[in-house]
Every structure is written in C-alpha cells, then in structure tokens.
Amino acid sequence: MTGKTQTSNVTNKNDPKSINSRVFIGNLNTAIVKKVDIEAIFSKYGKIVGCSVHKGYAFVQYMSERHARAAVAGENARIIAGQPLDINMAGEPKPYRPKPGNKRPISALYRLESKEPFLSVGGYVFDYDYYRDDFYNRLFDYHGRVPPPPRAVIPLKRPRAAVTTTRRGKGVFSMKGGSRSAVSGSSSSGSKLKSDELQTIKKELTQIKTKIDSLLGRLEKIEKQQKAEAEAQKKQLEASLELIQDECVSENADHSAEEPAEGAPDADGEELTDGVEEDFDEDGAHELFLQIK
C-alpha cells in the first residue's frame, strides 16, 4: 500500500477546528504499517492535511470534522497487520478505566511538555500517551473477560517402570528418570483411584442385587401363600356343596317314604264306605221286593 503524495507531520494545532477534525488511531502495528499506508487508507474519507505516526498509535488531521467522523465510523475495529484498530475522535477522549489497584491520578492527564500536544488548558496540554495507555488497558480488560479455550483431555498412558541412572561417584538422579518417575507416580495414583472407584461401584451393585433377590423371594412366597389359600378355599367350597347336595338327597328320600304311609288309611276308609253302601242298596232292594209282593 503506497500513497501518491505525503502530507505534513503536523497534527498538534490547538485551534478548535483542527482539534475537532483530528482522528486518533490506536493499537497500530507501526513496525509494519507506515505513514504512507495510513494516508492511503484514510484518504478515501477526505483530504488529509497532516499525519503523524508514533510507537503504537498515529494521528490523522482532516480538513473538516465531517471527514474525520466518517473515518472513525468506517475504520474503527478494522484489523490491519493482525491487530484491530481503536479509532476515535482526538478531541473527544474516552473516560479512563483503571484496573483495581492501579489508579492513575487526574494530574497524569496533563503535562507541561508533550511530543504531540493538541489541546492547551491553562498552560497544560493533554498527554497523547494517555490514549495509548487507555486503549491497551481496555484491550487487556477485554482479554480478561473472555474465558480461555477448554484444554484437550490427555488420555493416561500405561505406567512404565522408571529406570533412574546415577553418575559414577554421585548419587544424583537424571532429569529424565525423575520426570518419568513423576509421570508414572501420577498415572499409578490415577489408576489406584480408578480401581477404588470401581470397587465401590461393584460393592454398591452387589448390595442392590442382593436386595432385589430378597424382594423377588418375598414376592414368590407371597404368591405361593395366596395360591395355597385360594386352593384351600376352593376345597372348602366343594366340600360344603357336597354336604348340601347330600342333605337335599336325604330329605327327598324321607319325603317319598312318608307319602304312601299317609295315603293308606284313606284307601281303607273308601273301601269300607263302598261296602256299607253296597249292603244298604241290597237291603233296600230286598225290602222293596217284599212290599211289591
């Protein structure tokens, strides 16, 4: 990226028009991005009358405030040389947000001598380094808020027998042997923990199994008892039915035996009355026959 013409390096005029039309560019990789590159990028928003590049930041002076605001809106957060730019109006500094335990006094915003002063208040001028520090503080705050990426889970390897070597005449363990022993110790402790967990789980499962078996045995006993009770009740009902049937049969037999005994006197009486009537008829006929004679 190259520009056609280079502008002046003056970006520290104190008149209100210049202050309101000046753009601050923070988080700039000045080791790669040069002045001509900045002019080429920001010249599309309007005429540039001044451009100064410093370590980590730069200033661009436009002819009008409208061009400066358009550049801020269009180029803010743009990534150049691997870094997102922090662009804002130089005459509208953002409030300083210090980290806890690292407070910056208000007097630090002003100094008597400045490399690039742009606003004078009572003999003091704003410190442009304040913009740079503010940007980096905000950048670090952002990185602090972003959670780190999750680490990959490294599978445990089999513990190997750590063979330590010693120098002749000196009882000093080698670094490799020590690291291997540490790794083997950690892996063995991990395997012990796993075996303990497995043992506890196995015990719990066996306890649960015994409980289930006992419950099943109880259920089987209850079912057998219910079946036995049902069979006993069934037998009792059958026996009672048989007794009732036997009683009914015996009663019927008794009734059938009593009926002829009761009817015998009636038959004899009928025969007697019939004989008397016949005798009476014969006597009356004989008397009538005698009278006729």
Curated annotation (Swiss-Prot):
Segments forming domain RRM: 21-92
Region of interest (Disordered), residue spans: 159-195, 245-293
Superkingdom assignment: Eukaryota
UniProt keyword terms in alphabetical order: Coiled coil, RNA-binding
One GO CC annotation: nucleus
UniProt biased composition (Acidic residues): 259-284
Coiled-coil ranges from the UniProt annotation: 192-254
One GO molecular-function entry: RNA binding
Low complexity composition-biased segments: 176-192
PANTHER family reported for this sequence: HETEROGENEOUS NUCLEAR RIBONUCLEOPROTEIN, RNA-BINDING RALY-LIKE PROTEIN
Similarity remark: Belongs to the RRM HNRPC family. RALY subfamily.
Name used for this protein in its record: RNA-binding Raly-like protein
Organism of derivation: Bos taurus
